[in-house]
């Protein structure tokens, strides 16, 4: 069994290291050291195909566990984001032109890995009219052609309120439509300066209205300065637009230049969030310190459809 290591050693920097008045990282925030045959097979394939994963770019603490299960979240549209959200480790700036061949390489990788469940996400591409929605749609279509029994989850940006772009993705018929709310309304504009809470809620509502049987999903991070009551209020808002699946995890600052961690939420509090969300009608809830949006994603679609 792999030994437990600090998150900083898998790319998640402990925000207490730069400032002594920030909370000390608790013992329960440990991740397993990445390694193993499957891990290195996935890593090699991503390099060969010149593909990006959010697992690496966002410094996910679960990379070792997920890659050893031969699952990965493909990062479409390059590795440079046009936005500057204060929590995200993905590079910001002027991105390269969209690579129209990327969907083919992703689909080939899904086939090579013999995936039964693929997760597709992307950087924000506010520099192109459809926000890159056509790349999502084409990637879904090619995965369906090459691996017909593979289910597909898309974790999409807000497309800056371009509902035609949303429709383009929905028309490709993903199995799960995920759009993360990320935080509570009070913190939203500081945490995500170029996004709007109500716009994200509207996106999820429109997805449900257009495809009543689609599994919809959202997620948020806690420990960023919100109160537990505000978390419960967001859970209620998401249920109002009939979101099926919810993920809640601990916010971890990539380094001291990002939005600071205000506190470390206890495992007991995460259990309370999960119990409340299930009582409100969510069909599946992942809630825990190391939970990320795509964690155990292959389990969500089946649970949500029952």
Curated annotation (Swiss-Prot):
Boundaries of every Radical SAM core domain copy: 67-283
UniProt main location, coarse: cytoplasm
Assigned keywords, A-Z: 4Fe-4S, Cytoplasm, Iron, Iron-sulfur, Metal-binding, S-adenosyl-L-methionine, Transferase
Subcellular location: Cytoplasm
Entry-linked Gene3D superfamilies: Aldolase class I
MF (Gene Ontology): 4 iron, 4 sulfur cluster binding; lipoate synthase activity; metal ion binding
Lineage top rank: taxon: Bacteria
Residues that, per the record, bind [4Fe-4S] cluster 1: 55, 60, 66, 294
Cofactor note: Binds 2 [4Fe-4S] clusters per subunit. One cluster is coordinated with 3 cysteines and an exchangeable S-adenosyl-L-methionine.
SUPFAM superfamilies, alphabetized: Radical SAM enzymes
Keyword field contains Glycoprotein: no
Cofactor(s) essential for the protein: [4Fe-4S] cluster
List of residues binding [4Fe-4S] cluster 2: 81, 85, 88
Enzyme Commission number: 2.8.1.8
Cellular component terms (Gene Ontology): cytoplasm
Catalysed reactions listed for this entry: [[Fe-S] cluster scaffold protein carrying a second [4Fe-4S](2+) cluster] + N(6)-octanoyl-L-lysyl-[protein] + 2 oxidized [2Fe-2S]-[ferredoxin] + 2 S-adenosyl-L-methionine + 4 H(+) = [[Fe-S] cluster scaffold protein] + N(6)-[(R)-dihydrolipoyl]-L-lysyl-[protein] + 4 Fe(3+) + 2 hydrogen sulfide + 2 5'-deoxyadenosine + 2 L-methionine + 2 reduced [2Fe-2S]-[ferredoxin]
Pathway note: Protein modification; protein lipoylation via endogenous pathway; protein N(6)-(lipoyl)lysine from octanoyl-[acyl-carrier-protein]: step 2/2
PANTHER family on file: LIPOYL SYNTHASE (PTHR10949), LIPOYL SYNTHASE, MITOCHONDRIAL (PTHR10949:SF0)
Family: Belongs to the radical SAM superfamily. Lipoyl synthase family.
Protein name, per record: Lipoyl synthase
Taxonomic source organism: Chloroflexus aggregans (strain MD-66 / DSM 9485)
Lineage: Bacteria, Bacillati, Chloroflexota, Chloroflexia, Chloroflexales
């Amino acid at each position: 069994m792999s030994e437990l290591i600090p998150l900083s050693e898998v790319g998640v920097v402990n925000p207490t290291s730069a400032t002594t008045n920030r909370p000390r990282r608790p013992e329960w925030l440990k991740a397993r050291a990445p390694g193993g045959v499957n891990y290195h097979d996935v890593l090699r394939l991503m390099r060969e195909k010149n593909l990006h994963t959010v697992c690496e770019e966002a410094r996910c603490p679960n990379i070792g566990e997920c890659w050893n299960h031969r699952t990965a979240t493909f990062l479409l549209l390059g590795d440079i984001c046009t936005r500057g959200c204060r929590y995200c480790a993905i590079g910001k700036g002027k991105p390269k032109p969209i690579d129209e061949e990327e969907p083919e390489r992703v689909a080939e990788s899904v086939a090579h890995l013999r995936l039964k469940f693929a997760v597709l996400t992307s950087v924000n591409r506010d520099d192109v009219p459809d926000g890159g929605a056509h790349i999502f749609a084409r990637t879904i279509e090619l995965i369906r052609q090459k691996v017909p029994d593979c289910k597909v989850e898309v974790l999409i940006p807000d497309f800056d309120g371009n509902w035609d772009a949303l429709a383009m993705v929905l028309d490709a018929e993903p199995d799960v439509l995920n759009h993360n709310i990320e935080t509570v309304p009070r913190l939203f504009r500081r945490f995500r300066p170029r996004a709007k809470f109500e716009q994200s809620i509207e996106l999820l509502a429109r997805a449900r209205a257009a495809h009543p049987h689609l599994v919809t999903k959202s997620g948020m991070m806690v420990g960023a300065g919100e109160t537990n009551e505000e978390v419960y209020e967001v859970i209620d808002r998401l249920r109002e637009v009939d979101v099926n699946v919810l993920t809640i995890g601990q916010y971890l600052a990539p380094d001291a230049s990002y939005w600071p961690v205000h506190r470390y939420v206890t495992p007991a509090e995460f259990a309370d969030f999960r119990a409340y969300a299930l009582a409100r009608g969510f069909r599946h809830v992942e809630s825990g310190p190391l939970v990320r949006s795509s964690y155990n994603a292959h389990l969500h679609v089946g649970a949500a459809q029952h």
